[in-house]
C-alpha cells in the first residue's frame, strides 16, 4: 500500500453502520418515489445522501464525496423538476447507491482507497444531469 491509497479504517468503522442505514433509507425513499411519483420522497432521499456525504467527509474520503455531491445535485434537479426524473435517472441513482455501499464494504474488507474506481458511476450521474 502506498501513501495515496493508505486509509485509516478506524473512523470509518465507527460510522459505517450509520452510513449503511442512511443508504438503505435513501434506497427506500427512492423506491417510494418510483411507487408514488411524490417528489417529497426525492427530498428524503437527498437528505439521507447528504448524511452519507457528511460522514464520508468526516472520515477523510474526499474522493468519494464527489460522488455524493453529484448524487445530491441530480436529486435536487429532479425534485425541482429541472432535470428528467424518469426511469433512466432512477436507474442511475440505484446504481450509484449500490456502488457506494459496495465501495465502502470493500474498504472495510481491506481493499485500498481508490476512488477512481467510482469514476464510471460518477460519469453516469453527470450524464443524467
Predicted regions and their residues:
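Short, well-ordered alpha-helical segments
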Residues: 41-45, 58-74, 88-96
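Extended amphipathic alpha-helical scaffold segments
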Residues: 22-30, 63-76, 101
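Secondary-structure edge/capping motif, primarily at the C-terminal ends of alpha-helices
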Residues: 26-37, 56-59, 75-85, 107, ...
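Long, amphipathic alpha-helical coiled-coil segments characteristic
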Residues: 3-48
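Structural secondary-structure packing elements that flank or coincide with functional cores
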Residues: 1-9, 82-129
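Generic structural signal for well-ordered, non-transmembrane alpha-helical segments
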Residues: 17-20, 24, 43, 50, ...
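Beta-strand-dominated lipid-handling architectures at cellular/organellar boundaries
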Residues: 53
